[in-house]
C-alpha cells in the first residue's frame, strides 16, 4: 500500500514537472484566447466572492451585537491569514502549479465565507474569518503569478485588464447581492450560499484553461533560494508602494458598507453600493489603463493616482449622505492602475525570482489590510 502511494506521488510530481517545463519554454508555448480568459477568471471570481463579504459586514455586526473595536480585531485576523498565505504562495505555485493553487484558494475562501454567515459566536466567526483571509491571500498571489506568466508567454500587456477583472468581479458581486437583497428581498445567508456554489463551479470550469506555472524562468540563471520571500530592496519598494493601495482597497471592502450605513445614514440594503461604485470605476480604469499607459509613465500613474485618491478620501469623510457614497467613484478611478503597474514591473525585472517578488510584495502590500482595522 505504501509502495503504491509512493508511486502515485512520483507520478504526480513527474506530471507536474513535465507540464511546468512545457509551459515555461516560451518558444514552444502558444497562448490562446481561452488561456487569456482563464487567467482573467482567476481575478474575476475572487473579486466577486470578496464583494459578498463586504456586503455581509453590516449584517454580521448586527447579528453578533458587537462594536467596531471588536469587529476591527476580527477583521485584523482576516488580514493575518492573507499575509501568512501570501508568504508561502510562491512556493506552493512552484510545487503544485498555479492552476491547482487557484482552485485550492477558491475552495478555502468560499467555504470559509459560507461558514462565516452561519457562525453565531465571536470566536467561531473569527476563526472562520482567519481561514477566509487565507483563501483571499492565496487567490490574490496565485492570480497575479498566472497573469505575469500569461503576459510573458503572450508578450502582451494584460495586467491592467486582469486587475480590472478583480474589480469587475467586485462590481458584479456587489450588484447581484444588491438585487437579491433589496429588489427580491431574499435572506442574506441563502443569497450568499447560492452565489458561492455557482462561483465555485464556474472556477472549476474556467481553471481548465489556465496555464500551468511551476518555476520562475529566472531560476535557471540564478542561485536557487529556499526562502519563499525576498528582502531585496526591489521587493521591499514594490511592497511599500502596494501597501498604500491595499490599505485603501481593504478599508473600502471591509468598512465602506458599515461606514455608509452608520455614519452617512444610507439604508442597510443600499450600503453595499459604496464598494460597488468603487469597484465599478476601478474596473473601467483598469480595462482602459493599457491604452492610457501609452501616453503617461508608470511614475506619473502611481504619483497622480495617490494624490487624487487622497482628495477622494477627504471628500468621502466631509460630504454628507449620498454625496459621500458617490465619491467612491472618484476613489476607484484614482487608484485603478497603481497596483497593475507595480505587478507588471515585477514581471519585467530580472534581479530576483518572480515568485519571490510577488510573494514578498503582496505580503507587504496586504499589511495595509492589517493596518486598516
Explain the meaning of each model-derived region:
Residues 132-164:
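Cytoplasmic helix-loop-helix junction between adjacent transmembrane helices
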Residues 55-69, 254-270:
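Short amphipathic helix-loop junctions that connect adjacent transmembrane helices
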Residues 190-208:
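Symmetry-related core transmembrane helices of the 12-TM Major Facilitator Superfamily/SLC fold
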Residues 65, 97, 118-123, 318-320:
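Helix-breaking motifs and short loop linkers at transmembrane-helix boundaries and internal kinks
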Residues 107-120, 308-319:
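C-terminal ends and interior cores of transmembrane alpha-helices
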Residues 85-97, 181, 285-297:
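Helix-to-loop junctions at the C-terminal end of transmembrane segments
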Residues 86-116, 123:
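Conserved MFS/SLC helix-loop-helix module at the cytosolic interface between two early adjacent transmembrane helices
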Residues 299-342:
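C-terminal transmembrane helical hairpin of 12-TM major facilitator-type secondary transporters
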Amino acid at each position: 500500500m505504501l509502495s503504491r502511494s509512493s508511486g502515485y506521488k512520483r507520478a504526480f510530481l513527474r506530471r507536474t514537472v513535465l507540464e511546468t517545463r512545457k509551459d515555461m519554454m516560451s518558444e514552444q508555448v502558444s497562448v490562446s484566447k481561452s488561456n487569456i480568459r482563464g487567467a482573467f477568471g482567476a481575478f474575476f471570481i475572487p473579486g466577486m466572492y470578496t464583494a459578498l463579504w463586504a456586503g455581509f459586514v453590516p449584517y454580521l455586526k448586527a447579528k453578533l451585537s458587537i462594536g467596531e473595536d471588536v469587529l476591527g480585531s476580527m477583521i485584523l485576523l482576516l488580514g493575518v491569514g492573507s499575509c501568512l498565505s501570501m508568504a508561502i504562495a510562491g512556493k506552493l505555485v512552484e510545487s503544485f502549479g498555479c492552476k491547482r493553487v487557484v482552485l485550492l484558494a477558491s475552495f478555502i475562501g468560499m467555504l470559509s465565507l459560507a461558514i462565516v454567515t452561519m457562525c453565531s459566536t465571536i470566536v467561531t466567526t473569527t476563526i472562520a474569518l482567519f481561514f477566509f483571509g487565507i483563501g483571499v491571500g492565496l487567490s490574490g498571489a496565485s492570480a497575479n503569478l498566472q497573469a505575469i506568466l500569461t503576459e510573458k508567454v503572450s508578450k502582451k500587456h494584460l495586467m491592467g485588464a486582469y486587475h480590472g477583472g478583480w474589480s469587475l468581479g467586485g462590481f458584479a458581486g456587489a450588484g447581484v447581492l444588491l438585487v437579491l437583497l433589496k429588489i427580491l428581498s431574499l435572506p442574506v445567508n441563502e443569497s450568499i450560499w447560492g452565489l458561492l456554489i455557482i462561483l465555485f463551479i464556474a472556477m472549476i470550469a474556467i481553471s481548465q484553461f489556465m496555464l500551468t506555472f511551476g518555476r520562475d524562468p529566472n531560476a535557471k540563471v540564478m542561485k536557487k533560494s529556499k526562502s519563499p520571500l525576498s528582502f531585496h530592496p526591489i521587493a521591499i519598494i514594490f511592497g511599500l508602494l502596494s501597501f498604500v493601495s491595499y490599505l485603501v482597497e481593504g478599508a473600502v471592502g471591509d468598512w465602506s458598507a458599515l461606514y455608509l450605513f452608520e455614519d452617512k445614514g444610507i439604508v442597510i440594503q443600499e450600503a453595499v453600493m459604496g464598494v460597488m461604485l468603487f469597484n465599478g470605476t476601478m474596473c473601467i480604469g483598469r480595462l482602459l489603463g493599457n491604452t492610457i499607459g501609452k501616453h503617461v509613465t508608470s511614475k506619473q500613474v502611481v504619483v497622480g493616482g495617490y494624490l487624487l485618491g487622497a482628495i477622494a478620501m477627504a471628500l468621502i469623510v466631509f460630504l454628507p449622505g449620498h454625496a459621500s457614497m458617490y465619491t467612491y467613484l472618484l476613489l476607484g478611478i484614482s487608484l485603478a492602475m497603481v497596483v497593475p503597474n507595480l505587478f507588471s514591473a515585477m514581471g519585467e525585472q530580472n534581479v530576483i525570482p518572480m515568485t519571490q517578488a510577488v510573494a514578498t510584495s503582496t505580503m507587504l502590500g496586504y499589511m495595509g489590510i492589517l493596518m486598516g482595522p
